[in-house]
Amino acid sequence: MSEAFSDFEVIPAVDVQDSEVVQLVGGERGTETRYGDPIDAAKGWVDRGASTLHLVDLDGAFEGERVNADAFESIIETASVDLQIGGGIRTVDDAVELLELGVDRVILGTAAVETPEIVADIPDQQPGSVMVSLDAKGGEVVVPGWTEGTGLDPAEAATPYEALGAGANP
C-alpha cells in the first residue's frame, strides 16, 4: 500500500432494493442491475477481507421508512465486521434500534437535513456512532432518496453536524 493511502479503507456497499442487492445508475429508480441475495453479498465481502460494510436500504431512502430490516438484521447477526447502515432512518427510535441490534454506525440523511437536532437526540451515542450523509446533485443537497433539491449548499449544510455529535470515526 502506498504511503499516501496508509490510512485509507475501502468500504464495500451493499445497496438493497426489493430484498435484492442492486446498483442504481445515478441514484435513479428503474435503472438497477440486480445482484442477488444481500446476506450472500455481505458474506462475500467479509470473506474477501472487508473490515466494514456499508448497508443501504434503498427502498427506505425512497419511501421514508426502513423496508429491508429483515435482511439487514440477518447480516447484523452473522457479520463479524463493523457495520454502518443508512436509508429510511427517519426517527431517533429507528437509530437507537439499529445501534442496540449491534450496528456500529447509523447514517442519517434526510432526517438530519430536515431536523438537524435528531443527531443530538440519539441517546448514549458512542463516538462515531452517528454519521450524517449529505447527498448532492447539481450543487445542492437533495432529499429524500435523491429526488428533491433543498437549495442548500453541501459544504455550508455540513457545518452544524459535528457540534451535534455526528462523526465518521471513533
Where are these regions (language model features)?
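Non-catalytic positions within long, well-ordered alpha-helices that form the structural scaffold/packing
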Residues: 46-49, 96-100, 162
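Short catalytic helix/loop segments, enriched in acidic residues and glycine
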Residues: 28-46
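Alpha-helix-loop-beta-strand connector modules within alpha/beta enzyme cores
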Residues: 64-84, 120-135
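Catalytic cores of alpha/beta
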Residues: 78-106
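Glycine-rich, proline-tolerant flexible connector loops at the mouths of alpha/beta enzymes
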Residues: 52-70
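Haloarchaeal acidic low-complexity proteome signature biased toward cell-envelope/secretome components but also
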Residues: 1-10
